């Protein structure tokens, strides 16, 4: 978990929040959009089916630590709901209930016919950022489902100092690290 947290801080590639475009809420873009679910304690229930969501980017070995890594580092794949992506492409704003999922895989190599390079090995982590003013006064909250060798079914919001503050200060657009993901940069509406 400790190795993964610095990545979560940077992750939300898109992590979205109030941002340069102002704090006004954008309503959920579509009633069919998968929305965050919470248990009775307020913990986020781990989203399912995200593999069919819009893939917005990937990175390998991205870290916010000065420590050198051995090997290529972890693979990070980022997904959001198709409706949230479409709303961003149309308006430049992420709607309420937007979720970004950061899926972390260990690097693997030299399996089967592969003699060089790396590919995604076992999944080792999952982090989620959620834009939901009903559950987070700041607008966005970050959750880590890492629980040792398995993923937890629910997660409490992490303290704002762990992810939110960094996203608020460094994210390119609406608390999301759009700058790291060409798919989001290209989707952003351009002014005439």
Label for each model-derived stretch:
Residues 65-75:
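Short, polar loop/linker segments at the starts of domains and inter-domain junctions
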Residues 27-30, 36-39, 46-54, 58-61, ...:
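Sequence context surrounding c-type heme c attachment/ligation sites in exported
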Residues 73-85:
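Short, structured beta-strand/loop micro-motifs enriched in basic residues and often containing a Trp
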Residues 8-19:
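Bacterial N-terminal signal peptides
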Residues 17-28:
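Signal peptide processing junction and immediate N-terminal pro/mature segment
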Residues 1-4:
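Positively charged n-region of N-terminal signal peptides that target proteins for export
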Residues 88:
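Ligand-binding pocket segment of bilobal, Venus flytrap-like solute-binding proteins
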